[in-house]
Amino acid sequence: MEQQQPQQQNDGQQQQQQQQQHQQQQQQQQQQQQQQQQSEQERIYNKKQEHLPLLQTVEELVEELRRSLIVVEEFQTPSQQLLFDKLNKIINLYEKIESNRHIVNDVEIPLEIFRVIDQSKNPDLYVKETLQNCLSANEKTKGKIESIKNFKKELESHISESFASEYAEYKLLTQKKETQEQQNDDQIKVDDSNNNNNNNNNNNYNNNNNNNNNNINNN
């Protein structure tokens, strides 16, 4: 009986240490997730800034097409020069868009968007419906995950009470495995970050070269 009490105390201390280590790991994971989210937000912002000039050109082209359509529908002989000017401007805008097409080479557009546009519907509604469907699916998945987590906690609680020493040994082995996996994941993230930085540097270099070539051609 006296031997069992120290053994139970040791098991209790091990469980406390494991819980503390688990909490520390969770905090580290949360910090890493926050850093990843911040990096992703910065990447998206930089990408939007990169696409902004092209987007403005497209908007300008759409507006010129609209105005040209009005001129054509109400065409009169004195407005011929105005129509020529607008056509020349439209051509220049198309050329400008074509010269910057490399900026959006990595942009993927779902084909369903074009079907929506062909039906004279607002593509923003398609985006809204898609996001709503994703949110609904995520909520269902989240509910399933929470149920599994609660079941796991309840099961571990009963096992730790019934098989204290075996459970402590199991947690120790699991802790070692999680630590090794975390180290491997961290190394992979570092490698991916280095590769992304190299790719961004190469893209910036190519963009600068293209801009220089465009400036030379314009001159």
Curated annotation (Swiss-Prot):
Kindly state one GO CC term assigned in the UniProt record. Answer: core mediator complex
Q: Could you tell me what this protein is called?
A: Putative mediator of RNA polymerase II transcription subunit 10
| Region of interest (Disordered), ranges | 1-42, 177-219
Outline the subunit composition: Component of the Mediator complex.
Which GO BP annotation is one of this protein's? positive regulation of transcription by RNA polymerase II
**Function recorded in the entry:** Component of the Mediator complex, a coactivator involved in the regulated transcription of nearly all RNA polymerase II-dependent genes. Mediator functions as a bridge to convey information from gene-specific regulatory proteins to the basal RNA polymerase II transcription machinery. Mediator is recruited to promoters by direct interactions with regulatory proteins and serves as a scaffold for the assembly of a functional preinitiation complex with RNA polymerase II and the general transcription factors.
Compositional bias ranges of the Low complexity kind: 1-39, 194-219
Renumbered to this chain, the signal peptide range is none
Indicate yes or no for the key word Transcription regulation.
yes
Compartment(s) of residence: Nucleus
The answer, when asked if Transmembrane helix is one of the entry's keywords, is no
Basic and acidic residues bias locations: 177-192
Any GO molecular function: transcription coregulator activity
Native source organism of the sequence: Dictyostelium discoideum
Family note:
Belongs to the Mediator complex subunit 10 family.
Protein keywords: Activator, Coiled coil, Nucleus, Transcription, Transcription regulation
Database matches in PANTHER family: PROTEIN MTL1-RELATED (PTHR28051:SF1)
In which broad location class does this protein mainly occur, judging by the first location in its UniProt entry? nucleus
Residue ranges annotated as coiled coil are: 13-74, 166-219
